Structure formats: C-alpha cells, structure tokens
Amino acid sequence: MKLSGSYQINLEKQKVWESLNDSETLRKSIPGCESFTKKSDTEFTATATNKIGPFNASFTGDIQLKEINAPNSYIIEGSGNSPVGFASGKAKVKLEDAEEGTKLSYDVEANVGGKIAQIGSRLIDMTAKKMADVFFKKFSDLISSKNITIENENNASSMTKNNKILNNK
C-alpha cells in the first residue's frame, strides 16, 4: 500500500520539527495510541488499538527515525504485531517553508499480513487514509495550542490539506 499527502500547518518549520520529534505530542496525535515510549533519540516503542474492518486490532511495535536532516526531513520506519496480523512500513516526512507557515508532506509505503490482510486492500487503504487525516488534525491542534500557550499568540489556527480547510478555530 502507498499513501501520500501534504498539509499546511500555520507554524514555523522549526516548531513543527520539534513537535514531530516530541514523544508526548506523537502519543497524543496517533489514533488509538495507548503508549509511546522513547528508547533513544531515534527509537520508540508504541502500542495502538484501532478498528480495521471487523477487527479491533491492537498493535505493539518498534519505530525508528532514519536519514534525519533536521529540520527538513526524516524517514520513520516501524513494524508491529497483533493477534490479527502484522504491519510494517516507512514514511518519508518532509517540511518546507510556506507562505503561511510550514508545508508538511509525506510518502508512505506499508505492508500488512495475517488475518487483517484478508479484509482487502481497499478497506485497509481507506482506514489508513482516515488515520492519517486524524493524526494530522490532532497534531496540528496540539502544536497550535502549545504555540499559543508558550508565545501567547492569537488563537486562530488552521490546517489545510490540499487547500481544503480541516480545522479553523
């Protein structure tokens, strides 16, 4: 499965980068995340439970950050196991300065196997896209509110995906 997208986040690139490397922000942003533990600056373990088709899948796995080019890009690789199957994948995450903040783009390659793979690629693709949208909405909301708290800036924030406003407070 391949998935890609881009998001506009109305914060400067350095703040977005720092948040992408903050384990607590990631834990709160990942759909269904029950735990997210930092093992080193580039290694984490995580457990997340999500409904995928008829399965309530709880995955536990390892995550590594590679090819780090701060504050511009990295590759995040992970693999996890569940009683209903396994998943593995990697995502190239890239940050670029944009007119109103930062453009975050990603390209994901993922594989699933076991019982969960039997539900079909279309349902898996739809679920993955939905989870990516939920992640980036939560991520944007969290880092925007952190920015407001720290810098006492105007609380108007927005995140756009391909020019479609997803959140506008």
Q: Where are the model-predicted features located?
A:
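Hydrophobic/aromatic beta-strand elements that line small-molecule binding cavities or substrate pockets
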Residues: 5, 34, 61-67, 89-97
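Hydrophobic pocket/interface hotspot
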Residues: 16-20, 26, 65, 106, ...
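A conserved amphipathic terminal alpha-helix motif
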Residues: 115-154
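Hydrophobic ligand-binding cavity/cleft-lining segments
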Residues: 1-47, 157-169
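Glycine-rich portal/gate segments that line the openings of hydrophobic small-molecule binding cavities
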Residues: 37-79
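A generic beta-sheet turn/junction motif
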Residues: 9, 50-54, 69, 82-84, ...
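Intrinsic-disorder/low-complexity, polar/charged segments enriched in Ser/Thr/Lys/Arg/Asp/Glu/Gln
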Residues: 2-6, 43, 58-60, 73, ...
